[in-house]
Amino acid sequence: RFHSRVAATLDEAIGQACSETGAHALPSLRAVRRHLEAIEQAEVGVQAWRDARVRRLEAIDELLQTITYVASECTCYVTGRAGEGHVDDTGPAIVRVVGAASAPQVLDALESHGLPPMEVSSLATRMGSLAVAHIIDGLLHVDLLFLPDQLASHEPFSIVDGEAVPMVDIVNFSRLIQALRAASASDP
């Protein structure tokens, strides 16, 4: 359903599939994402799927480099699934932008460097309400979360519920991409 674009979100696709099949137990999002990956790999081939994943990660890396160029006072982290090298159409990659003096100034600078205008919303967190910029542009599907420079902003825990989350800084994200690229090249 999600893969064929009948449903707009994974939750909607799961609900429709359960309704149609009469299933009472919902599969986990992880199981659904694995199933979606398998469908995509079967459609385009494993190597093409790996190459596409690396290109999406490289687009995020380029965004991180641009952020650190236009706002050198900021520290960036990639969190969640993207921080482990998993990107797909099921949701945005999450990037924490820590220490930005002003989210609007950073966003203006990013737009002056070629990014499209971004929709901005707010997110209720344990630190209060924070600005979130939503980027959907080509290979980029990213939410930028603007956090104050506090200890909690630099720790690998969800700023919403406090649960542990994968988190890598810009250097380790680049290393992750290099490792995935090398693994993809050596394992055709």
What annotation goes with each model-predicted range?
Residues 65-66, 83-85, 126-140, 173-188:
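A short, terminal or domain-edge coil/loop segment
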Residues 146-188:
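Catalytic cores of NTP-dependent nucleotidyl/adenyl transfer enzymes across multiple folds
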Residues 95-99, 114-118, 152-153, 161-166:
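Short, low-complexity, polar/charged sequence segments that are solvent-exposed and flexible
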Residues 61-93, 97-110:
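Active-site nucleotide-donor binding segment shared across nucleotidyl transfer reactions
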Residues 115-151:
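Conserved catalytic core of two-metal-ion nucleotidyltransferases
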Residues 5-8, 27, 101, 165-171:
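Short coil/turn linker and secondary-structure boundary residues
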Residues 2-78, 133-138, 143:
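Helical scaffold of the NTase/Pol beta-like nucleotidyltransferase catalytic core
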